[in-house]
Structures are given as C-alpha cells and as structure tokens.
Amino acid sequence: HDITESATNPTFDDFQGYSGNGTSSYLIIDYNPATDADNLALDDASFGIYFITAPSGTHPGYGNGVYESDAGSRLWINPARSADLERGYINNASVIERTFTGSVGLVTLTRTGSTTAYAMVNKVLGTVSEVESVAVPSGDIYLCAANIDGNPGGYHTGEISFVFAGKGLTEAQIADIYDCFDAYMTAIGN
C-alpha cells in the first residue's frame, strides 16, 4: 500500500526511516485493516513495527495504528518508552503489555484466537494474554501518531523503519523477520 505523507511532513532519514516531531507530523498509510486486509482477520492477525529510535519521555498515549471507538477496538502499538514497557492492542480494547530491556527494535503483536494474543520485542516472547477480540478496527493506519476515529493523536518522535500487518505469524516467523532486517542493517553499516 501507499504511504501518504501528512501536510506536516515527518523527517525521512536514508537507510533508517521516518520520524515525527512529536506535535504535528505523521504518516498516513493507505491501508485500512477492516477493508484492505486480504489476510488479517479478527482472530488471526499480526501487526509489527521496527523502531530505530524510541521517543523521549514516558507518555503512555503515544501511538501508531488505528482506534475505532464505535467498535471499541484498536490495532495499535505504543513505541518503546524509557519505562521498558511495550503496550499494544490487536483487534481489542484492553492493553497487551510486554516488559523488556532496551528501547528499540521489532515490536510485534499477534492474535491467534479470540482470547489468545501476545507481544514480542525483537525475538523475546511476552506473556500470552487472554484479552478477548472484539472487532477489526476500521480506518487507515497512521505512523508517528495514531488514527483516533479519523483524527491524529498520540504524536511521538520515535523513528520507524518498517511496518507490517497481516495473518498471524508464528514466533519463528517473527524471529526470521527480525534476523533478516538485522542482517540488512548490519550489511549497510547501520
């Protein structure tokens, strides 16, 4: 899908990715998980973002993704924060959390059933959550901010290299994505 930059363009760094300014810049991804998803389903989904840098501060409202309040559902990843706590939502309204050491890397949320979801940071699995799925949220995914009922919010300064959404991935598949990107970044000297 296409990336449509907002009127207040985020910064793009070659071989790194996009970052917002924390107040007004963000990306609109021309991808609505409720209508464009060939493989993403209510109880079979993964959503991942690779963060090159984390935003400053510990604001819990930072976001990337989409929130549809009428459906009570989010497909949303908070960027890593100094509190070493990753938070996100995958077709649900209750938070899924994973504590970890560090503040950058691949953050992936996966749902494999109506009450089975988990977060991974890089290749480390978090506790499996029993948060129940409610709906696949409708609205384009935003990065460097979140789409909250069609409006940007939760702006942040974290730098994002890539994002993916689709069918639920296994732990091994997520580890393969991480290893491939890590090898690429090492090969180009980053």
Which residue ranges define each predicted feature?
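Polar, enzyme-active/binding microenvironments
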Residues: 1-190
